[in-house]
Amino acid sequence: TPLVQMGPNDWLLELFHGPTLAFKDVAMQMLSRLMDHVLRERGERLTIVGATSGDTGGAALEAFKNCNGIDTFFMFSNGKVSDFQRRQMTTIGAENCHAIAIDGSFDDCQSMVKDMFGHQSFANKIRLSAVNSINWGRVMAQVVYYFTAAAALGAPEQRVSFTVPTGNFGDIYAGFVAKQMGLPISRLVIATNENDILARTLTTGDHRLESVKPTITPSMDIQISSNFERLLFEAAGQDSTIVRDLMAALKNNHNYSLPDKMLTFIRDSFDAGVVSEIETLEEVALILRNTGYLTDPHTAIAVKVAREHADPDVPMVTLSTAHPAKFPDTVHDATGKTSHPPVWGDIPAERSETVAHLMNDRACVEAHILEHFFRAQKLINSTAKD
């Protein structure tokens, strides 16, 4: 995770040097090995089911493809991820890895995953587990690069700020955990696109769901950020009753209002900025023109927001969460340049895709998962007899 200097007290933290060219690799590669080791020791199997707005699915399927005791299923919104992101999921070619295209939004996919955990008979039968950022292991691994980046820039004597492209709130929440652990973080800045529920919440205290707007930064096309609930728990003084009531209001009324004390707690650590679609394209071009550096659109949003929240006395680190080659059409539209993936992240054009297209219906998805589960069990039993 190298730091690249863009200007005075202006840094990028490159998190895209893993096998799928996204920051999700940092945690996923560790988590897959830990889970596989424990399951082998116990002689057990698990089924992972997850939802992805783009990068998590590819990173998870890549990380778990050699874990024979773990069957991995990932849902994504059909047509709402880039071609490169889709092919990362659909060309894995491993018997235990499955990509599912859903006719619905990412929030629909994520809600189905949560509901599956509440469907006890299903969850128990397949031994359901998760590796989305609701998995604490993911957050824990991401805390590390906040410490390494800050230490490289002079911490603990020097305070450091971070700006993070934010969708599901897991990456920036890891920064909050680092701050709670004692890392001298001045500000944590949420950078988002026009799906700006987190920025609106920070400004007004009103957390109100709106329709998801499809954009050129699909990893931010989210209205329900799972890890924001973790921050609410801290803001509520770890009172789970308060958080439960807020979540119930969100589910039933599609909004809640934060008490002043909780809002003040959040504002003590966080700022936020919103960047439009046009501004994103302009920023990708501006960064290239000024520095010769090509960014993906999510990183470009964060760079613009970081500039708007810069303090000349405090280093600002912008998290660069994906390689620009993951979004070639957007990068080309903005700059006229073609970004090619490094050799280790390239996907041969002739590699075939395998994907299940399913309705936005939990029962339908569960039936699909069970079909594969029973088929795998039958194969295991047959092998054991031999």
Model-derived features with residue positions:
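PLP-dependent amino-acid enzyme catalytic core
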Residues: 1-386
